[in-house]
Amino acid sequence: DGDGVELAGDHDFEAPMPTFPFGTHVAVVEVDTDTGRTTLVRHIACDDAGNLLNPLIADGQVHGGIAQGVAQALMEEIVYDEDGIPKTANFADYPVISSAELPSFEIVHMATPTWVNELGAKGVGESGTIGGIPSVYYAIIDAVSHLGVKHIDMPTTAERVWSAIAAARS
């Protein structure tokens, strides 16, 4: 009808510096020393992403990140031939982790608001991947360290774990 009032707003926010989330992850694994097969039994993640705007989405971000980290620690690897051509270029050759290989993750959120923005929020998506990889890797090393194993190349496939155990025993 032409008598309406238009309401428009515009705002730019530029943070004076980036925010930094903090956290820690603990993985519990079982390693079959006869086969090298590793099973992730438990994974606990405590993350401080400041004020969570949507805790359900934050949980999903952390769960997805942990799954990526576990996959990188246990199975993901790009392999090239002698000419530099990828040999793991599709899902038939490149292993992808699924929920069948993963336990239910235990997520704990801390909330230390940042002063950098008015919401007090920090990033949350990367924390699962960043904490997931070393927690799983070092849980495996810890599980076989009594056998003399000090290092295993990633990914820590059953073959690599078994080879490291065999080398330490000889």
Task: Give a label for each model feature.
Residues D1-S170:
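C-terminal catalytic domains of large/alpha subunits in multi-subunit enzymes
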